[in-house]
């Protein structure tokens, strides 16, 4: 698709939902993408104006079987572990014992 000109006039506002979709694609083979939905919420307000941030609104573990920890940076591991901790804290109170055991395994720290 050809885009005649860039349009930067759009803006994110409180309550808008978007997705975060990191992925990898191997040309001519396949691709894989992990998707989470995020909501735009108010953050800090200062002399420069109202800042916004994103909060997760979907809480599903990322499949650790598809991850090679040795290829991740320390920051990437920290982000994944923090996300899985949040998934555990949000979801586990609503699960029975068997379901909690499953979630514990799939949100384990790497």
Stretches found by the model and what they are:
Residues 1-110:
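Charged, cofactor-coupling segments
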């Amino acid at each position: 698709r050809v885009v005649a000109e860039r349009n930067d006039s759009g803006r994110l506002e409180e309550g808008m939902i978007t997705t975060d979709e990191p992925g990898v694609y191997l040309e001519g083979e396949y691709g894989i993408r992990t998707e989470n939905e995020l909501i735009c919420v108010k953050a800090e307000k200062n002399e420069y104006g109202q800042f916004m941030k994103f909060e997760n609104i979907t809480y599903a573990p990322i499949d650790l079987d598809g991850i090679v920890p040795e290829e991740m940076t320390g920051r990437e591991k920290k982000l994944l572990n923090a996300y899985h901790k949040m998934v555990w804290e949000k979801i586990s109170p609503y699960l029975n014992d068997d379901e909690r055991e499953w979630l514990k395994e799939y949100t384990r720290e790497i």
